[in-house]
């Protein structure tokens, strides 16, 4: 009797900590009623609250950066030789990267959009891979491939060509991580063009070059422009792959992100000033992009 009574007491205590199914359903129905009432009274707040949280997450760090960077030495840092060299190198290498992406990426994007061949999906996967790779992995891969003792770099070194820790290495690292953005955007732009337009151009006697230059290129212009600007901005902010493959040599491989990293270790004021300069350049570029897109739509 003692064991049986203890079991009854145990199960009775355990059952007290649990709500019966009817009580649980009652709580859920009350919660649903509250949600419905909240939606009826303030239906927009369901969208405003999470949106405001995310916008605050975007705005507050930039605001804090601007506030902390404003001091008496701001213009001295912004007009310093280090800032000028880093900005000039960033603009030059990013522009070269964008040009290489357009020149070599446009034909590749057109092939992927219009041609049908084996292993096409694998090639698309290979092109998109640098977009999702961690920058450190990209830099290490470039160093293993094109370093002096790398798989292909050792062969280049026999001909007197050494890529690591040069300006060419900066451009190569930027192309590796940024050019896939252009190829992806251009491929989507070419894919969205109606194939009947190509057939009509063929009927009118247009050759392959005329078809591409006079039909495909103008119709995909918005996607090509968007991809080019994405490539430029991604190259401008490239850090991880560049520091592993090209290093951080002032005037040679020290782009703006490199100078910010070095300034963070030595002088926070320089890092803050260079960060603001990069933010201003990025904002100007985004405004230019919006204006070009608006003209294209008009």
Protein language model features and the residues they cover:
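Membrane-interfacial helix termini and adjacent extracytoplasmic/periplasmic loops
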Residues: 30-37, 84, 139-175, 246-249
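Transmembrane-helix boundary motif in ABC transporter permease subunits
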Residues: 38, 75-77, 96-127, 140, ...
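Transmembrane alpha-helical segments of polytopic membrane transport and secretion proteins
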Residues: 2-50, 117, 288-298
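Transmembrane alpha-helices
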Residues: 49-53, 129, 176-190, 194, ...
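Transmembrane alpha-helices and adjacent helix-loop boundaries
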Residues: 133-139
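Periplasmic/extracellular loop-to-transmembrane helix junction in inner-membrane transport proteins
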Residues: 31-45, 64-99, 111-120, 262-268
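Short hydrophobic faces within alpha-helices
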Residues: 129, 196-204, 271
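Interhelical loop and adjacent transmembrane-helix boundary motif
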Residues: 33-34, 38-43, 75, 81, ...
């Amino acid at each position: 009797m003692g064991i049986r009574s203890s079991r009854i007491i145990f199960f009775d205590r355990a059952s007290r900590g649990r709500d019966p199914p009817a009580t649980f359903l009652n709580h859920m129905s009350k919660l649903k009623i509250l949600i419905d009432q909240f939606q009826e009274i303030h239906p927009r707040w369901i969208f405003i609250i999470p949106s405001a949280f995310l916008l605050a997450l975007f705005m507050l760090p930039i605001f804090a950066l601007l506030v902390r960077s404003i001091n008496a030495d701001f213009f001295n840092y912004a007009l310093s030789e280090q800032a000028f060299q880093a900005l000039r190198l960033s603009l030059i290498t990013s522009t070269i990267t964008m040009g290489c992406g357009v020149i070599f990426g446009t034909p590749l994007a057109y092939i992927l959009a219009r041609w049908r061949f084996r292993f096409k999906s694998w090639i698309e996967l290979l092109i998109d891979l640098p977009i999702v790779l961690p920058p450190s992995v990209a830099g290490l891969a470039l160093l293993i491939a094109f370093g002096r003792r790398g798989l292909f770099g050792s062969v280049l070194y026999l001909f007197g060509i050494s890529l690591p820790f040069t300006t060419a290495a900066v451009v190569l690292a930027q192309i590796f991580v940024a050019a896939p953005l252009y190829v992806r955007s251009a491929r989507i732009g070419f894919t969205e063009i109606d194939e009947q337009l190509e057939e009509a151009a063929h009927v009118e006697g247009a050759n392959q070059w005329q078809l591409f230059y006079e039909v495909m290129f103008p119709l995909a212009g918005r996607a090509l422009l968007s991809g080019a600007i994405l490539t430029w901005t991604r190259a401008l902010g490239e850090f991880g792959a560049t520091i592993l493959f090209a290093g951080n040599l002032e005037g040679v491989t020290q782009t703006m992100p490199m100078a910010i990293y070095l300034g963070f270790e030595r002088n926070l004021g320089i890092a803050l000033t260079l960060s603001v300069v990069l933010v201003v350049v990025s904002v100007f570029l985004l405004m230019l992009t919006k204006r070009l897109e608006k003209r294209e739509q008009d």
